[in-house]
């Protein structure tokens, strides 16, 4: 005679794990949409370098349009009719290829082909981008408007990220921009009519001008502080604080709302 073992209750299969698609990463998105701008100086074996980034800004009739954004002084300081824009192409076998191409920035009379914000160091111009870059252009809605920094409680000490080409250097031979981080160093930030720029605590070098300044969840805020519900572009790096010959290691950022205003001027009727 023997006892029968009672089999254990069947173990329920765990519910399938639902893996959601990763959220779109503005950091990688902006890296893909940021380009080097340069022009060789006519009187020296050097070149003038700046940074630009692409915005997807459809025309009023809905037709697609890719707009290059940079600091006005970057293009204004390039006296020749052509600059170079640093496109990058992914190789089918892997890796990337840096392939700068000419960018017409002045007409035959020497007049600028870009549109300048009337008061801020912001320039925009429509560009014919390669398909991969046109797809990488950042949607216009990701540019912070005049009320965004208040709504998202961005304040002094908060981290923001920026992309650029300091001294003309890139992150690698493929021409990708260098990612850096700084903290908001001024207060108040708004209203932007009274405070059109704000300070960022990080060293600025030639070649950084025109780069995007942005927030993503990877940037640190004070513990317990309000977290914005999605990433955004806060502004454009335009210059540095330099009271004399010695820089202070502090950047000056123009609010992204002025980029919106400059893009709107592309669609304004031509003057008489």
Which sequence ranges carry the predicted segments?
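C-terminal tail/extension regions appended to the core domain(s) of diverse proteins
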Residues: 2-19, 241-272
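Serine endopeptidase catalytic core focused on the charge-relay Asp
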Residues: 32-35, 39, 48-49, 78-197, ...
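A conserved glycine-rich beta-strand in the N-terminal activation segment of trypsin-fold
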Residues: 40-67, 250
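Short consensus segments that form the blades of beta-propeller domains
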Residues: 43, 172-176, 225-227
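A residue-level detector for short acidic-glycine micro-motifs
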Residues: 54-56, 186-188, 215, 238
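Catalytic nucleophile loop of clan PA
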Residues: 199-236
């Amino acid at each position: 005679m023997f006892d029968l073992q009672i089999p254990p209750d069947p173990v329920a299969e765990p519910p399938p794990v639902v893996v959601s698609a990763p959220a779109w990463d503005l950091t990688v998105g902006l890296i893909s949409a940021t380009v080097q701008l340069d022009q060789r100086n006519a009187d020296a074996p050097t070149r003038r370098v700046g940074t630009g980034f692409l915005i997807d800004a459809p025309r009023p009739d809905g037709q697609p349009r890719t707009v290059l954004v940079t600091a006005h002084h970057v293009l204004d300081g390039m006296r020749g009719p052509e600059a170079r824009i640093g496109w990058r192409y992914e190789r089918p076998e892997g890796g990337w290829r840096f392939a700068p191409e000419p960018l017409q920035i002045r007409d035959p009379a020497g007049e600028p082909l870009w549109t300048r914000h009337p008061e801020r160091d912001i320039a925009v111009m429509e560009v014919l981008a390669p398909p991969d870059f046109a797809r990488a252009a950042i949607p216009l809605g990701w540019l912070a408007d005049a009320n965004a920094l208040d709504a998202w409680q961005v304040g002094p000490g908060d981290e923001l990220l920026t992309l650029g080409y300091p001294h003309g250097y890139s992150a690698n031979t493929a021409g990708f921009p260098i990612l850096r981080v700084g903290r908001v160093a001024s207060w108040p930030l708004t209203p932007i009519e009274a405070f059109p720029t704000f300070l960022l605590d990080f060293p600025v070098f030639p070649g950084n001008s025109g780069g995007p300044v942005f927030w993503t969840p990877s940037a640190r805020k004070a513990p317990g502080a309000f977290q914005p519900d999605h990433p955004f572009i806060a502004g454009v790096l335009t210059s540095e604080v330099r009271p004399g010959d010695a820089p202070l290691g502090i950047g000056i950022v123009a609010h992204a709302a002025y980029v919106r205003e400059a893009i709107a001027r592309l669609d304004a009727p031509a003057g008489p």
